[in-house]
């Protein structure tokens, strides 16, 4: 109706209205390894070595919450029992041609996500670990705690995307940032709601935990096509 049935014009108008999707670095379009494991640096080095030994490409290594020391899955203290030399581990991954990204759950706080205290805390800690050699962050919707959005029309999940994107951009300067985020509209492969009309502008959209089954992959591909059609 809006463009006389011209799908290309409709998408062009939508992007003009809501903003373009940033282009990630070329390696983020490659092969990823992402599983929830309580593993050590040695375990992850073995993953990289096994990929190489068997002739399979590996471009991105995703490390879930067990890189951090806190039992509640928050905070930025390194789990020294799993990663006694985090700088060395990240440097070794780079030598193997692999980018590394950490999962991040926000902490419990009564402050607005835009308060100076919260912004300072997130900025200093996210950038501190980037300075160790981390390539990017996965801003993961925390099921226990959530950022507090001061705007009723902007969800905590979407606001977090904006905050993390700005913090990473501030650190990266003119370089591309590496940010993965939760898709607002999806929970573990199941569509729950309409997408945020601005969420697509911030990071690689992650649709949740899935199993390694053909039908699950089919559902993910279907979701990707369906939601892309409406601008997610």
What are these regions (language model features)?
Residues 1-232:
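Catalytic-domain carbohydrate-binding cleft regions of carbohydrate-active enzymes
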């Amino acid at each position: 109706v809006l463009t006389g049935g011209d799908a290309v014009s409709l998408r062009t108008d939508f992007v003009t209205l809501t903003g373009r999707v940033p282009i990630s670095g070329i390696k983020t379009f490659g092969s990823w390894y992402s599983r929830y494991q309580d593993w050590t640096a040695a375990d992850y080095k073995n993953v990289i070595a096994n990929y190489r030994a068997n002739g399979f490409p590996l471009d991105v290594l995703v490390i879930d919450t067990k890189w951090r020391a806190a039992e509640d899955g928050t905070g930025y203290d390194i789990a020294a029992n799993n990663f006694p030399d985090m700088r060395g581990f990240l440097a070794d991954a780079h030598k193997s041609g692999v980018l590394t990204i950490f999962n991040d759950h926000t902490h419990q706080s009564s402050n607005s996500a835009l308060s100076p205290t919260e912004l300072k805390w997130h900025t200093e800690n996210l950038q501190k670990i980037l300075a160790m050699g981390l390539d990017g962050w996965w801003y993961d919707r925390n099921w226990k705690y959530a950022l507090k959005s001061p705007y009723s029309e902007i969800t905590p999940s979407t606001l977090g995307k904006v905050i993390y994107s700005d913090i990473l951009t501030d650190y990266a300067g003119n370089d591309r940032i590496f940010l993965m985020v939760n898709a607002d509209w999806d929970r573990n492969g199941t569509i729950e709601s309409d997408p945020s009309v601005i969420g697509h502008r911030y990071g690689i959209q992650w649709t949740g935990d899935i199993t390694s089954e053909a039908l699950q992959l089919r559902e993910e591909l279907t979701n990707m096509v369906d939601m892309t059609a409406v601008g997610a």
